[in-house]
């Protein structure tokens, strides 16, 4: 073992100060004057050990650019920005482990100069500075060992002249190169830009650092560290049957295999399928092979429909069926995909017990893009990192050939083809592993199965370890009386993660697989017609917009162009179509809360446009919002839906269990969680202004329109009901039990003049009422908010309102309250709420202050949850789902964000858990007793189709399983979990079922932006 008699020098002052702003050039010769940063940016020195031959390792970031707010004041001291401090802190914590304690590092950059304007180093800068970096590494690294580099960004690899397809594809893999005749081992990890976006990425960073320090330890113990482990070494004990007899013998051996005296869970087998397509519903689907593992290092691959397979699917069906129906516990990684694939081929898999992708999400809920098997393997089993490179190189080569061929064809075409939708291109290139030779596919597929099983065994232990560690932390914290409430667990279940896996994740996986495979019928004729009509409406809308735009523009105005819109809103102004006056917001940027881009230009995003509509009644902004919504709906959603449903007339959306940190589902192909609502646009047609309504949800209908109903059960104000459970607010609980609409209730309480003005000096009463939009004539009662349509009327139906102006203001104020309440419950800050909702900060302040006074439990809940984040680092729902927010190692801005995310998490996660529980509960009853089929789940709703004769029973079904059953399973819920149940021939044509008949569903004309606002508030939290 190496001896360390003294601590290396850690001063940062011995490196000479070379800064072309403050002294001589950093780089001798001509390089600095040719650089973009020359005399525009400061030079930053490295940090850590800097004596010659003293560094055991180097941590290299791309540049000193500060991604987020920093309290750094010295213009030349590097690695002192907030994210960089967090990185150093994690390294220091890991080095407290005895085996890593003797090793010291140097923290430096691939490029040394930066400024606010210089977000990303250019290729020229990297080239110029690489000589400085190489000299630093050779000078400070220990002379008798390879140079070890922990890389934080793709620019670092460029400095070493290493070319990779994508930086993300090599993260967690050990790379090798050479400088000045010395071997260099590089471990690429997350960049500072990535670390600035998600708190969960610090878990990935920590795992990478741990692996890297292990390599440091191995090298200092003269152990061989080889980044190029061979596939033959990994697959030495694998089996690859070549006859049907060998297939039968393999299955017999797997079923008979057991580990005497060990936990029965270790008898599990892992399964994985390799296919020629990513879409299970496609006619071209072939299961190229099935891979299985039954112990560490024991795996096999059974060819099935690969072109080189010596038998047919039917030949091996009996053997595979025995395997799938056996009592052996089954393990998958992203099992939803494999279950769909096998179901298409007529197989059912019994005793599914574990999904390693979902288990990883239960352990680390916020590391999006790092739930793939190869990413997890790189973190847990570094010797396997990069095992799939050969297959990915083949696939990349095929993609590159297709790109070149398409470019060549495009040049030869005389008439350009219309732009292809993203989905259409994805389908056209969907070949899966069909180009991979069987021998290669067998080996790599079997490694997948082997690693999946190894990972499952490790995760089982991690579940137990975390439960034990958290229990101990809570016990220690609860010793102090003031921390007992904070230390209390969310659930009494001693093993909540295991319960979630067995009781929620696995059942949900099976049901979602069935829903995805079934798909939802697309009325393609209607969708195509709608696309044409929307194109016409968009053209007319552009004409209407152009009439507001100054004629002096030298080019046609494009509503999607931020640059042109900015020049009008904050430059020339636009013409109000009603008054004819010129409107411009230049000089009012601060007043309306304008945000700025990274290039210091006024942002023209949706938040600003909504603010202008709400605060200023901006006609141009409203038309732009509508136009952009239509453009997105037509060119993205409808175009992709038509492409994805072309083969069988159905959309087979892909639900993602690991898509959000809260446990809510996300989806893709196509994103049904973001399905546009009805869009109503006023356009001038032949000199006459008309309302044109585009019903996008109508695209989705039942399988048999003559005999079936499309039912949508939507949880009513789910988040507010969950808040009532966590806050125990007596007034809110009473209102919900009495069946009151929570948003009208909040509005009536807040906008009562006596409540609103309680803490306002008398001389400011009038100004406050004017600020909020309340007069002293109307009542502003709960009944009035509920009956706003009576006051407002309906021009389209010829119904004259009793007080249209009052009705309009009631609707506006109710929406504002609804949005503000959601923002608070989601943990958004007041200024974020103001900018997203589209009200002034002053209005937001008054409303929030009144809410805090009327409902003090809101503030108490928020404060309590933030204290849990600060002291325990974990918040837990009633179901035991956890959000890990260890703020100690986070930069300042992410620390604040983590506290808000804790507030957001409890509400959203608990609500989602109940909705998904109802989805799972009704599945079997729906199919068995009502002849129905689950189709979708969107946010807090569940959609299914049933025969028309059972329409009335849909309400009973939801009452039994969505209200009564939820009440029994959730005794902590003090209010009924109510639902709005609607039905109709399609998703977009719905009437409310009340048990005795139907009543019209009242449509919100601004519904298309309501969900957008809600999503933004959730993201802000």
What does each model-found stretch correspond to?
Residues 2-221:
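A polyanion-binding, active-site-adjacent surface
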Residues 48-53, 57-58, 66-70, 75-98, ...:
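Conserved RNase H-like, two-metal-ion catalytic cores of nucleic-acid enzymes
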Residues 87-95, 161-174, 182, 186, ...:
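Metal-dependent phosphoesterase core characteristic of DEDDh/y 3'-5' exonuclease domains
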Residues 145-148, 324-330, 554-555, 707-711:
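Short active-site oxyanion
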Residues 218-306, 350, 379-381, 387-689, ...:
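Conserved "right-hand" nucleotidyltransferase catalytic core of DNA-directed polymerases
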Residues 360-368, 559-560, 566-570, 750, ...:
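Short, conserved secondary-structure transition motifs
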Residues 417, 425-434, 508-517, 614, ...:
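Conserved catalytic core of nucleic-acid polymerases
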Residues 955-963:
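Short amphipathic alpha-helices in soluble, non-transmembrane regions
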């Amino acid at each position: 073992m190496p001896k360390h008699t003294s601590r290396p020098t850690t001063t940062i002052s011995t490196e000479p100060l070379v800064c072309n702003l403050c002294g001589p050039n950093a780089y001798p010769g001509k390089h600095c004057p040719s650089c973009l940063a020359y005399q525009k940016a400061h030079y930053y020195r490295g940090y850590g050990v800097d004596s010659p031959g003293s560094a055991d390792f180097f941590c290299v970031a791309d540049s000193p650019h500060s991604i987020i707010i920093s309290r750094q004041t010295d213009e030349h001291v590097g690695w002192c920005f907030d994210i960089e401090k967090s990185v150093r802190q994690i390294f220091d914590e890991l080095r407290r482990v005895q085996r890593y304690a003797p090793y010291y590092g140097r923290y430096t950059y691939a490029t040394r100069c930066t400024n606010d304007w210089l977000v990303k180093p250019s290729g020229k800068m990297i080239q110029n500075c690489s000589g400085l970096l190489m000299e630093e590494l050779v000078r400070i690294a220990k002379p008798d060992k390879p140079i070890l580099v922990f890389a934080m960004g793709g620019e670092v690899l460029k400095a070493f002249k290493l070319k990779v397809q994508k930086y993300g594809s090599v993260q967690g893999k050990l790379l090798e190169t050479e400088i000045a005749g010395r071997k260099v081992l590089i471990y690429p990890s997350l960049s500072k830009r990535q670390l600035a976006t998600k708190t969960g990425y610090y878990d990935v960073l920590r795992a990478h650092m741990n692996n890297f320090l292990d390599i440091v330890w191995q090298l200092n113990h003269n152990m061989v560290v080889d980044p190029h482990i061979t596939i033959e070494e990994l697959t030495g004990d694998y089996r690859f049957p070549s006859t049907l007899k060998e297939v039968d013998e393999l299955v017999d051996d797997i079923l008979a295999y057991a580990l005497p005296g060990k936990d029965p869970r270790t008898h599990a087998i892992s399964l994985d399928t390799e296919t020629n397509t990513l879409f299970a519903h496609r006619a071209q689907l072939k299961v190229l092979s099935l891979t299985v593992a039954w112990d560490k290092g024991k795996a096999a691959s059974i060819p099935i429909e690969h072109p080189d397979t010596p038998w047919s699917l039917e030949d091996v069906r009996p053997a595979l069926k025995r395997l799938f129906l056996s009592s052996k516990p089954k393990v998958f990684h992203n099992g939803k995909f494999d279950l769909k694939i096998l179901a298409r081929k007529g197989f059912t898999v019994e005793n599914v017990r574990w999904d390693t992708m979902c288990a990883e999400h239960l352990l680390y809920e916020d590391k999006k893009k790092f739930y793939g098997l190869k990413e997890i393997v790189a973190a847990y089993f570094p010797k396997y990192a990069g095992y799939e490179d050969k297959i990915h190189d083949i696939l990349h080569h095929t993609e590159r050939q297709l790109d070149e061929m398409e470019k060549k064809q495009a040049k030869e075409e005389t008439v350009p083809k219309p732009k292809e939708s993203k989905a259409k291109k994805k389908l056209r290139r969907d070949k899966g592993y069909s180009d991979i030779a069987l021998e290669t596919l067998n080996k790599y597929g079997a490694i997948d199965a082997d690693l999946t099983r190894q990972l499952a065994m490790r995760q089982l232990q991690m579940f137990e370890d975390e439960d034990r560690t958290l229990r101990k932390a809570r016990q220690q914290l609860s010793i102090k009386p003031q921390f007992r409430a904070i230390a209390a667990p969310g659930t009494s279940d001693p093993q909540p993660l295991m319960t979630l896996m067995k009781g929620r994740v696995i059942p949900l996986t099976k049901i979602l697989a069935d829903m995805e495979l079934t798909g939802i019928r697309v009325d393609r004729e209607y969708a195509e017609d709608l696309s044409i009509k929307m194109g016409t409406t968009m053209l007319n809308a552009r004409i209407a917009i152009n009439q507001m735009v100054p004629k002096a523009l030298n080019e046609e105005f494009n509503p999607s162009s931020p640059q042109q819109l900015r020049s009008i809103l904050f430059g020339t102004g636009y013409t109000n179509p009603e008054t004819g006056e010129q409107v411009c917001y230049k000089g009012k940027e601060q007043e309306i809360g304008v945000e700025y881009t990274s290039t210091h230009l006024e942002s023209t995003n949706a938040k600003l446009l909504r603010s202008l509509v709400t605060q200023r009644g901006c006609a141009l902004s409203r038309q732009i919002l509508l136009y952009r919504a239509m453009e997105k709906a037509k060119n993205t959603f409808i175009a992709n839906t038509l492409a994805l449903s072309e083969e069988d007339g159905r959309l087979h959306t892909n639900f993602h269990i690991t898509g959000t940190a809260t446990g809510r589902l996300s989806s893709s192909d196509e994103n049904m969680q973001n399905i546009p609502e009805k869009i109503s646009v006023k356009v001038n047609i032949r000199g006459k202004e008309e309302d044109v309504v585009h019903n996008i949800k109508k695209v989705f209908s039942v399988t048999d329109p003559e005999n079936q109903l499309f039912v949508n059960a939507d949880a009513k104000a789910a988040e507010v009901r969950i808040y009532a459970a966590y806050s125990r607010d007596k007034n809110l609980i009473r209102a919900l039990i009495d069946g009151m609409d929570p948003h009208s209730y909040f509005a009536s309480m807040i906008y009562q003049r006596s409540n609103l003005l309680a803490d306002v000096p008398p001389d400011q009463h009038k100004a406050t009422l004017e600020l909020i939009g309340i007069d002293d004539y109307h009542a502003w009662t709960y009944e009035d908010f509920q009956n706003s349509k009576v006051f407002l009327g309906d021009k389209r139906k010829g119904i004259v309102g009793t007080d249209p102006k009052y009705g309009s203001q009631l609707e506006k104020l109710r929406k504002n309250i609804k949005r503000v309440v959601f923002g608070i419950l989601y943990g958004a800050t007041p200024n974020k709420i103001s900018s997203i909702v589209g009200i002034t900060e002053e209005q937001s302040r008054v409303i929030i202050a009144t809410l805090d006074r009327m409902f003090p439990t809101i503030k108490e809940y928020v404060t309590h949850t933030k204290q849990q984040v600060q002291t325990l680092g974990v918040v837990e729902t009633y179901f035991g789902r956890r959000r890990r927010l260890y703020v100690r190692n986070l930069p300042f801005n992410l620390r604040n964000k983590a506290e808000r995310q804790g507030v957001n998490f409890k509400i959203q996660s608990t609500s989602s858990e109940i909705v998904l529980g109802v989805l799972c509960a009704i599945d079997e009853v729906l199919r068995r007793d009502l002849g129905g089929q689950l189709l979708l789940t969107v946010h807090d709703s569940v959609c299914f189709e049933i025969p028309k004769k059972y329409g009335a029973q849909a309400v009973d079904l939801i009452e039994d399983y969505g209200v009564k059953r939820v009440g029994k399973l959730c005794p902590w819920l003090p209010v009924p979990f109510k639902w709005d149940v609607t039905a109709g021939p399609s998703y977009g044509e719905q009437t409310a079922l009340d048990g005795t008949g139907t009543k019209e569903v009242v449509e919100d004309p601004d519904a298309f932006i309501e969900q957008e606002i809600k999503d933004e508030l959730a993201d802000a939290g």
